[in-house]
């Protein structure tokens, strides 16, 4: 356990790995070697760092499977972010939670559509009744006795003194 957390041991293993890679690949023109070495270095460092963390986590918690799964998912997501990917690895629990949230949202939207559809049907029925009430029906004789503006109409002959009482007369005012 002490060797795993020792920085000198880690650096010597990294140096050994780089020397081994240099001896295997002797082509000096290989352009991707620094990238491969960097990825392998990061993987080795994560491996060295994750072993003590896993041992402590397993001893401290009772649910070892979930802790290991969470650690592995976190490590993979970190590697994906380092590589420049925007995608992430999710566990089945997270997928189920997201699916439950999506199903709830779809149910809420379906209920809203149902309410709106019911309201629209009611509005169409109301508009139909209003339209039916506004349709003009041809009538042969119109009874004008019930019209308010047709009561008590006097003609020019029926007015007193033959003058229209509603026409203005000339008024002079003193100044």
UniProtKB/Swiss-Prot annotation:
Family matches, as InterPro entries: Rotavirus_NSP4
GO cellular component: extracellular region; host caveola; host cell rough endoplasmic reticulum membrane; membrane
Transmembrane region(s): 29-51
Post-translational modification: The N-glycosyl content is primarily Man(9)GlcNAc, with a small amount of Man(8)GlcNAc.
Residues that coordinate or bind Ca(2+): 120, 123
Glycosylation sites: 8, 18
GO molecular function annotations of the record: channel activity; metal ion binding; toxin activity
One Gene Ontology term from the biological process aspect of the record: viral process
Membrane disposition: Single-pass type III membrane protein
Subcellular location, principal: host cell
Compartments, as annotated in UniProt: Host rough endoplasmic reticulum membrane; Host membrane, Host caveola; Secreted
Listed HAMAP family: ROTA_NSP4
The protein's assembly and partners: Homotetramer. Interacts with the immature particle in the viroplasm. Interacts with host CAV1, early and late in infection. Interacts with host integrin ITGA1/ITGB1 heterodimer. Interacts with host integrin ITGA2/ITGB1 heterodimer. Interaction with microtubules blocks trafficking to the Golgi apparatus.
Domain notes: Binds 1 calcium ion per tetramer.
Similarity field: Belongs to the rotavirus NSP4 family.
Protein function: Plays an essential role in the virus replication cycle by acting as a viroporin. Creates a pore in the host endoplasmic reticulum and as a consequence releases Ca(2+) in the cytoplasm of infected cell. In turn, high levels of cytoplasmic calcium trigger membrane trafficking and transport of viral ER-associated proteins to viroplasms, sites of viral genome replication and immature particle assembly. The secreted form acts as an enterotoxin that causes phospholipase C-dependent elevation of the intracellular calcium concentration in host intestinal mucosa cells. Increased concentration of intracellular calcium disrupts the cytoskeleton and the tight junctions, raising the paracellular permeability. Potentiates chloride ion secretion through a calcium ion-dependent signaling pathway, inducing age-dependent diarrhea.
Protein known as: Non-structural glycoprotein 4
Source organism (scientific name): Rotavirus A (strain RVA/Human/Australia/RV-4/1977/G1P1A[8])
């Amino acid at each position: 356990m002490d060797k795993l957390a020792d920085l000198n041991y880690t650096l010597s293993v990294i140096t050994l790995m780089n020397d081994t890679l240099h001896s295997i690949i002797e082509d000096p023109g290989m352009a991707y070697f620094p990238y491969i070495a960097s990825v392998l270095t990061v993987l080795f460092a994560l491996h060295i760092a994750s072993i003590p963390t896993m041992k402590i986590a397993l001893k401290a918690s009772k649910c070892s499977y979930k802790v290991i799964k969470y650690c592995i998912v976190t490590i993979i997501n970190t590697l994906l972010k380092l590589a420049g990917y925007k995608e992430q690895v999710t566990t089945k629990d997270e997928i189920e939670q997201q699916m439950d949230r999506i199903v709830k949202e779809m149910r809420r939207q379906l209920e809203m559509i149902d309410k709106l559809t019911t309201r629209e049907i009611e509005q169409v029925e109301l508009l139909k009744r209003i339209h039916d009430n506004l349709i003009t029906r041809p009538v042969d004789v119109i009874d004008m006795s019930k019209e308010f503006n047709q009561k008590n109409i006097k003609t020019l002959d029926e007015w007193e003194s033959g003058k229209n009482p509603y026409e203005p007369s000339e008024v002079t005012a003193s100044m």
